[in-house]
Amino acid sequence: MLQPTDTTPRQPVLTCGPMPHTLWDISPPIHSGSPVFPGDTPYSQQWVASIGPTCPVNVSALTLSPHVGAHADAPLHYDPAGQAVGELDLTPFIGPCRVIHALGCGPLVRPEHLAHALPPAPDRTRHSHGWHPLPPRVLVRVYARMPQTAFDTALPALAPETVELLAELGVLLVGTDSASIDPADSQPLPSHQTIRRHGLRVLENLLLDNVPEGDCELIALPLKLMSADASPV
């Protein structure tokens, strides 16, 4: 959920702008056709109880990878000794945020692709180009239209030096509308490992199709899943 700086909801949401606020639900719909990483568990639903003469309610059972749809990766996802998602401090997942567009930038989003929305070196704390100092959360939009019917094997990813720069600038959380911050066929996962080294948090599979560049309030709280490697947000 995104809000234009000034409010507070729940689900991935962004809010931005002057009153009345614009509110963006940045979670894609989740259903049996939702794209999943090749080999991962897709969404499925079974009814285990149905309203009838002897049952007053409908109850379903869900099966899915926690990486289906908009989600937060836990350190456990890329570090065998890392924290599970239910153990994480929620602070990075709520608060001031900047959305930066890096559309059509190729397979890797590099620092120069974000430079137009970052404070200039050497003093990156000053206002510049109409931007305020960088908030501690950054969402990078890489798609004009996020794929919602098939997995993108050529997904745009973040170069590790881009994550490194954002960490140096004090960012606590990095998010994207791509399915991963690393290329789909990456084995060493250099950007995830940069996230790990700096203790950052990461959001993936966000729906940013209609979200403009600018500063917002982010609300993307993971579930308290005490042994999981990720959580829907």
Task: Describe the residue ranges of each PLM region.
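Active-/binding-site microenvironments in catalytic and ligand-binding cores
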Residues: 2-233
